[in-house]
């Protein structure tokens, strides 16, 4: 009788945990759905981004988008900002890598996706990052990192070792092409 009661208690505990996990999953799904609904109407391209993308396309410079956003969010953002035309299948999602940012793995995977050697070619890659987590990953991958001021303060990006900070792509192009 004791063994039967212990198994019943164990099963009840497992069911309780399972219900909590399902409820958490449901809440997460709803939160992400609400995020996408709000974000799609408020996303705005940074100044100079379209011109910058056209310039690197004209020079046949390979590019890849690397993000920690869940797939649905990443696809929505790229489409809403009309960046999907430039990246197509060239997107690395941190959540689908062995390690997500701030680990360098997503950037290493991005370089490999472009046919680059992460050890030999990282120094020739430029990464635009607006988060300390992403900048940390890119610096650790050995890339040249340009911090973009969207929601973070410059000092937060400087602390993790970015090489340059700009407010948008127009400023980057002005500084880069004047060299």
Residue ranges of predicted features:
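Short, acidic loop-to-helix structural element flanking the phosphoryl-transfer center
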Residues: 21, 37-65, 71-75, 124
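Conserved donor sugar-nucleotide recognition element shared by glycan-biosynthetic enzymes
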Residues: 4, 45, 103
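Generic anion/oxyanion-binding catalytic loop in active/binding sites
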Residues: 1, 13, 20, 38-41, ...
């Amino acid at each position: 009788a004791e063994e039967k009661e212990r198994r019943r208690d164990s099963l009840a505990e497992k069911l309780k945990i399972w219900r909590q996990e399902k409820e958490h999953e449901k809440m997460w799904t709803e939160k992400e759905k609400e995020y996408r609904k709000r974000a799609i109407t408020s996303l705005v391209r940074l100044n100079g981004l379209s011109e910058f993308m056209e310039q690197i396309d004209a020079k046949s410079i390979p590019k890849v988008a690397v993000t920690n956003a869940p797939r649905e969010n990443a696809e929505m953002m790229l489409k809403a900002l009309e960046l999907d035309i430039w990246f197509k299948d060239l997107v690395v999602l941190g959540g689908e890598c062995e390690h997500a940012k701030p680990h360098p793995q997503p950037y290493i995977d991005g370089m490999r996706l472009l046919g680059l050697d992460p050890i030999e070619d990282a120094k020739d890659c430029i990464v635009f990052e607006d988060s300390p987590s992403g900048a940390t990953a890119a610096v650790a991958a050995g890339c040249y990192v340009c911090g973009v001021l969207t929601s973070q303060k410059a000092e937060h990006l400087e602390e993790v070792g970015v090489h340059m900070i700009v407010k948008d792509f127009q400023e980057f192009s002005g500084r880069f092409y004047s060299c």
